């Protein structure tokens, strides 16, 4: 938050300025076994939404990208692996995320940008179905 605010005056002087926050699929619905992580990503989502509106008047685009789990050493070496990891993803690479970040920086994209086919489908379901459906989906994906 502090770094984003510190950059604001510099962004105002830039051509086509953009802030791309790293949110997560975990910011769509709280993830069992990952409550703290989900809460932090919900905060990123809220910050993105607020600044997207607030800074638009200054010509600064603020968006986020929302990947599910990414295949990195951190994920591979985790002592605990939540059941949802294997069901929702873990097959995206850092290059996939970098490509989405580049797209967000260089194209006119939505405020929230899901990454990966499975999560894009879940996010679409969340928009068109009652919220109870998202809860049921998360319960199913998180079962042990």
PLM regions and their residue ranges:
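Active-site helix of classical SDR
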Residues: 4, 40
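Catalytic Tyr-X3-Lys helix of short-chain dehydrogenase/reductase
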Residues: 8, 43, 48-56, 61
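Residue(s) in the substrate-gating loop at a strand-loop-helix junction
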Residues: 24
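Conserved catalytic-site region of short-chain dehydrogenase/reductase
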Residues: 27-29
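Active-site loop immediately N-terminal to the catalytic Tyr-X3-Lys motif
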Residues: 31-35
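SDR active-site lid
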Residues: 53-117
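Short-chain dehydrogenase/reductase
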Residues: 112-126, 138
């Amino acid at each position: 938050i502090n770094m984003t605010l510190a950059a604001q005056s510099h962004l105002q002087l830039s051509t086509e300025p953009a802030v791309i926050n790293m949110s997560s699929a975990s910011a769509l619905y709280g993830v069992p076994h990952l409550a703290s992580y989900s809460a932090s990503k919900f905060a990123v989502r809220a910050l993105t939404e607020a600044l997207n509106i607030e800074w638009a008047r200054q010509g600064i685009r603020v968006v986020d990208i929302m990947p599910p789990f990414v295949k990195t050493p951190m994920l591979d070496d985790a002592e605990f692996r939540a059941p949802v990891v294997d069901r929702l993803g873990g097959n995206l690479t850092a290059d996939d995320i970098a490509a989405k970040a580049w797209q967000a920086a260089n194209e006119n994209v939505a405020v929230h940008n899901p990454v990966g086919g499975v999560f894009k489908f879940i996010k679409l379901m969340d928009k068109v179905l009652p919220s109870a459906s998202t809860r049921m989906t998360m319960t199913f994906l998180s079962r042990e």
